[in-house]
Structure formats: C-alpha cells, structure tokens
Amino acid sequence: MKKIGVITNREKDKGLKYTNQLVESIEKHGGQAVLPTYDGSFQMDDIDNQVVEICNNCDMVICLGGDGTFLRTARTAYLYGLPMLGINLGSLGFLTDVEKGEIDKAVENILNNRFCLEDRIMLTSKLYKDGKLIARDVAINDIVISRGGIPRILHLSTYIDNNLVEMFPGDGIVVATPTGSTAYSLSAGGPIVEPTSGLILITPICPHILSSRALITSDMRKIKICVSQGFEHKATVTVDGQKNLEITGGDYLEIEKANSTVKIIRVNSKNFFTVLRSKIYERKEE
C-alpha cells in the first residue's frame, strides 16, 4: 500500500474541499493518506515543519496550492528523496502538474503506477563575507542578487570557472535552473529552456549596458558573482523567492549544481511545449 503525504496551503483551500477530495481518492484507490497535525492556525512557514513530520512515514508527497507552495514543500521533501506531485490551486501553476478537476484520475494513475518521474537539477549557493562562508542554501528555481529597495546601480562581476564573463551594472542578476527558466528569469528577458536540460541560466536584471544579454552555460560549470567593493548599501540575495539574505560590497556568491535533485511526478500526457503554450502564450488572467 502506497503511503501518500498530503500538504495543503490552507489559504488556497480554506474549506479543505480539494484536500478532502484528494484524501477520499487516495483511500478509494487503495492508498493511505498521511496528513500533518493541525493546530487550527496556518502560516506558510508551517509547511516546513509539516513536511518534516510526514516525510518519514510516506512514499511520496502531494501538495495542494500554487507554485510557491510546491517550492516550499519540495525544498524540504528532496532531503528525503521523495517524489512530489503538485495540484494547482493557484493561477499559473507551472510546477503543479494537476488541475483541480483532475485529482481523482491523477491519484488512480499514481496508485496503478501509471506515471513518470522527472529529475530536476537544483543549485547550491554559498555566501561569503570577508572571505568567510556565512550561509549556504539550495534553489529549485533561482537565486537572485538584486538591489532590493535601494535606488542605486548594483555592479556585479560574474565569473564562470574563475573566468570573468562580464561586469553587469544594473538591478541585479538571476541565476536559474531550467525549471526556473519560466519564472523570474523569463520576466527579466531570459530564454525558456526545457526543464530537464543540463543547463544554468544567467540573466541580468535591467542591465545598464547595451551589450548585456542573458547567457546559458553547462550545469557542470561553477559560477561566482562578486559585489563591487565600492557598493556601500545593502543588496539582497533571494533563494526561490522565499529566503532572503543581505549582501554588500566585497561579498560574493558561489553557485553550482547541487548533488541532489528534485523528483517530480508527471501523470499528464501533456508535454512541456503544450504546457508552455497554455501557461504562457495563451494565458488568460483571471
């Protein structure tokens, strides 16, 4: 019997209509639903502890919410090597494969082993101040170095395998995985790449230079981004749009492919280009 962990963004499923539907489908098709304890209140930060609570007692995780909920869940679930499926209760839903009306069919497919797994690369980031490592993290979508709310140009020297590529003046840089190519990197003018590609994207944000363009490199490369010594203000490093750190002149980031991957369950026959067309090119705002 497959044990399926269930994580819900209760802000998007306040009456638990879709959560209850999911649990009923799991039990109907011969599985066992594993749910975290609930104390009557909910904040997005609660998801981290909920994932830890259920991951030791399940074979996979299904989360209900938007892409933000999926990222929040996956950033912990990957530590347990568990595959994940997302049910879209948000607006765009690039990472959440299943729509609300497809829940029962998706569960039936999973419990009858009619699904495939996609291994998506992640990035590790290490932040150095005065030459000392002070923080490290992993990203599924992207790592963003930005000027934040400071109205000053941020000068970022970017290296690949210790070779200087460019000194980017502007609002910052997005370093993205293929999975993250349809997120902030896309909005900043970066290319769209297939999510299972072995690539890393580097996209300047509002660069104050005519020749500056996004670039793509192999995921075997190591990237270093240095803040110019003369920058006296506080800029920001943001990981997957969820974790923030301060960075200032002389600080630098080292970024490379992580040793682990995120395992994403796919139950739909829609290929990436079909999803891309429906989510981006033909999108209708609600």
UniProtKB/Swiss-Prot annotation:
It is found in: Cytoplasm. Involved in the regulation of the intracellular balance of NAD and NADP, and is a key enzyme in the biosynthesis of NADP. Catalyzes specifically the phosphorylation on 2'-hydroxyl of the adenosine moiety of NAD to yield NADP. Belongs to the NAD kinase family. It is an enzyme of class 2 (transferase). The gene is nadK. This is NAD kinase. The keyword Signal does not apply. Keywords: ATP-binding, Cytoplasm, Kinase, NAD, NADP, Nucleotide-binding, Transferase. It catalyses: NAD(+) + ATP = ADP + NADP(+) + H(+). It comes from Ruminiclostridium cellulolyticum (strain ATCC 35319 / DSM 5812 / JCM 6584 / H10). The active site is at D67. PANTHER family: NAD KINASE. It comes from the Bacteria. Its EC number is 2.7.1.23. Transmembrane segments: none annotated. Its cofactor is a divalent metal cation. GO terms for molecular function: ATP binding; metal ion binding; NAD binding; NAD+ kinase activity. The keyword NAD applies.
